Each structure stands twice: as C-alpha cells, then as structure tokens.
Amino acid sequence: MPASLSPGSGPSADPTRRGGVGCLVASLVVGGLFAVATYAGVQWFRDGMDLGGEVCRATANGSTVSFSPEQMDNAATIVGIGMGRGLPARAGTIAIATAIQESKLRNIDYGDRDSLGLFQQRPSQGWGTPEQILDPHYSTNAFFDALVRIDGYEDMVITEVAQEVQRSAFPDAYADHETEGRVLDSTLAGHTQASMVCRLDAPVTHTEVEELVADLETHLRVSGSPSEDGRSFVVEAPSEQVAWSVGQYLVAKADRHAITGVQVGELAWTRSDDGDALQWGSADSDGTPTRVVATLTPTEP
C-alpha cells in the first residue's frame, strides 16, 4: 500500500516551492500583459498613427489600413490602371497584395539580385529595362498583362495566382496582405464611399494641371477640365461609383498634385495637417452625386 500523505506533508506544502510557483505565475501574467500591451501599442502606432505626421488611411468592410502618402499614391496608380483596363476587382486586390509583399508599395530601385520597382520585376527575366520597370505605369501594366494570361485567376487563391506571376521564393507571404488589398481596392474603386483620407502638410508647390489631366486619362481613363482661374478641376463621372473612385483617387494623390480639397456630391475632404483631414464632412455647397471637384493650388500670379 502506498504511504499516505498527511495534510501538509506533500510537495504542495513546501512554502519555498509555493512561493516559486507563485512568482512564476505572477511573472507569466506580467510578461503576458506586457506582451499584449506592447503588441497593442505597436498596432496602435502602425494602424492609428495618431502621433501626427503625414498619413493616408482607407477603410472598408470594418478594416482600416494606413500608409504613407507615397505608398497610397502607388496604390491608387495600381487600382486606377486596373479600372481603366476594365479588370475585375479581384485583379486589383491581387496586384495590391503582391506589391505590398514585394516592395511595401514603394517604387524602389533595388532588390534581390536585379529586382526593381513596385513588383520587384527583373530585367533579366524579361520584364523590361530598368527604366521601364521603375515607371509605375509600365510595371503595373506588365503585372496585369501576366495576370490576365492565367486562366481562371479570379477564382484562384492569392498565393497560387501571385506565384504564377511572380515566381517568388515565399509564395505564402502574399496571403498576409489580402485584407489590405481588398480594403484598398474597394476604396479606390469607389465601392466604399468617403473612406479614403489623408493628413498632409500644406503644399509646397502648385498644381500642374496638365500632369493631373494626364494622370486621370492614363490611369482611370476619365477626363476633366480646370476652371478658368485654375483653382479647381471638375470631373463629370458616368456613375456614382466612378465618381467616388475618381474622388478617392484624387485624395490618394493629393500630395503629388498639390490638391487641397476634394468634393464628391455633398461630401468633401479638406486637406490639413491635423485630425480634421482624417474624415469627410459636409461640403460647403451641394453637388450632384456624379460630380467630382478638386481644389487646386494655383500658380502665383
């Protein structure tokens, strides 16, 4: 018969051990809370970025993503080209997720071996010359050209279809950015309204109207016209969705084109370096749902 343990005679009665276990539990709890707090702080800094400074945000389907003005400018180029080509939303999502994984949406002039640009395409693999690949318009179209040659790409999981195009050493990583791709495509394609905002410093240059016209016609394939005084630019869109696509595209490119405000219908985004720029508000004047008006920075008289 095994020896019986009287109360207080077993290992649990050892006060030293009890204290050690208690300290261990306390350490684990404190460590866990610290880890959670650290993670939450990093997420708050990454996603909220409310410490000031320039930032752009897009929100759709309950998710919000934050990027620098440069990154959001490139995202707008990608989605805009996809729309201009008449491609489905899935194509934009795939392209955005791929560019986030490959370059973090930056048009970088370096990479693994001879990889370059938004999609880290390689001249040695026939993607084009270095100069061509470093042109976001060219590199995005090259990506879409390869994508549409894949039968059934719209129904494929993103890891498979992106790998077919990119031949990456880490194909599973593309899936990490699918939610970001969906949010940016939904916003920039106009499916989600009043959901693209940018907090920006005051413009340091004036709007080059010819560049703005070329940007819209080349990417979104829409046209507009400046006012006589050069202080605004108007686009009459064929539908409300296209109007929101154009409007939020212009917000995403406000830094590039020195745009100080965008109005779509009865809502408006106004450029500023504070929290007011992180939301759309009521416009000063009523507008038709399909009219987009961008306020420009004119040249000095």
Question: Predicted segment positions?
Answer:
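Extracytoplasmic/secreted envelope proteins and their assembly/folding machinery
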Residues: 72-79, 92-95, 118, 137-144, ...
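Solvent-exposed, acidic/flexible segments
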Residues: 67-71, 75, 87-91, 111, ...
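Short, functionally critical alpha-helical segments immediately adjacent to catalytic or ligand/cofactor-binding
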Residues: 79, 89-104, 165-166
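Non-catalytic terminal regions of proteins
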Residues: 3, 206-301
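N-terminal export signals and maturation junctions of secreted/periplasmic proteins
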Residues: 2-80, 193-194
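Peptidoglycan-targeting cell-wall enzymes and recognition modules
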Residues: 55-66, 104-157, 164-169
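Catalytic and binding regions of secreted/periplasmic enzymes and modules that target cell-wall glycans
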Residues: 140-208, 227-234, 263-269, 292-301
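N-terminal carbohydrate-binding/catalytic regions of secreted carbohydrate-active enzymes
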Residues: 82-84, 109
